[in-house]
């Protein structure tokens, strides 16, 4: 799936030198040996597929069981069922036609912009959606990393800005050097699902 090209950068520092104006050079597939090995050994889920704990990953299974047993995830939280209606699915594959917030046990921001969980779980805090300090803002970016992000990272660096970058696991597998650059530049990195199917 990931190809190695002799003329392509082989590390994050070399990849950072490529600019968007060099496209499609910065978007040619490249193969990081460690990432390619992890994918071939099935240590990572297949890119762009809904992830599950990999077979034989006993540590991950143990951690997942600890999370479930801790009670931090309310027992009544259920995955919204996806429906494909006329013209395709809505809200990342979840149909909100006829959605009634009062009957939903969850706080579904996509449908109602609610910010406070309805569950009686002490560990579930309301969403942070405002910055109470005047002239302050939070800077976040979703769905990275992407092959053409070098100029984006350069811009943030030039403006002396740090951001929270929500990376999709499949994108990290496909563009590991861009992911490393975000981390090396001092940004906060958060997981944004493996495949962004919802």
Model segments located where?
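Non-catalytic propeptide/linker segments at domain boundaries
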Residues: 2-131
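Active-site beta->alpha N-cap acidic-glycine motif
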Residues: 71, 78-198
């Amino acid at each position: 799936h990931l190809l190695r090209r002799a003329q392509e950068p082989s590390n994050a520092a070399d990849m950072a030198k490529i600019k968007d104006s060099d496209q499609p050079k910065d978007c040619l597939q490249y193969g990081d040996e460690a990432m390619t090995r992890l994918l071939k050994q099935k240590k990572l889920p297949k890119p762009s597929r809904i992830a599950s704990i990999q077979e034989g990953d006993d540590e991950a299974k143990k951690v997942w069981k600890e999370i479930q047993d801790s009670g931090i995830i309310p027992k009544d939280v259920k995955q919204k069922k996806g429906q494909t209606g006329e013209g395709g699915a809505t809200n990342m594959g979840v149909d909100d036609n006829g959605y009634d917030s009062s009957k939903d046990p969850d706080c579904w921001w996509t449908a109602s912009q609610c910010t406070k969980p309805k569950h009686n779980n002490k560990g579930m805090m309301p969403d942070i959606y405002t910055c109470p300090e005047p002239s302050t803002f939070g800077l976040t970016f979703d769905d990275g990393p992407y092959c053409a992000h070098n100029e984006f990272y350069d811009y943030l660096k030039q403006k002396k800005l740090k951001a929270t970058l929500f990376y999709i696991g499949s994108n990290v597998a496909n563009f590991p050097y861009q992911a490393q650059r975000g981390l090396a530049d001092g940004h906060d990195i958060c997981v944004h699902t493996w495949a962004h199917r919802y």
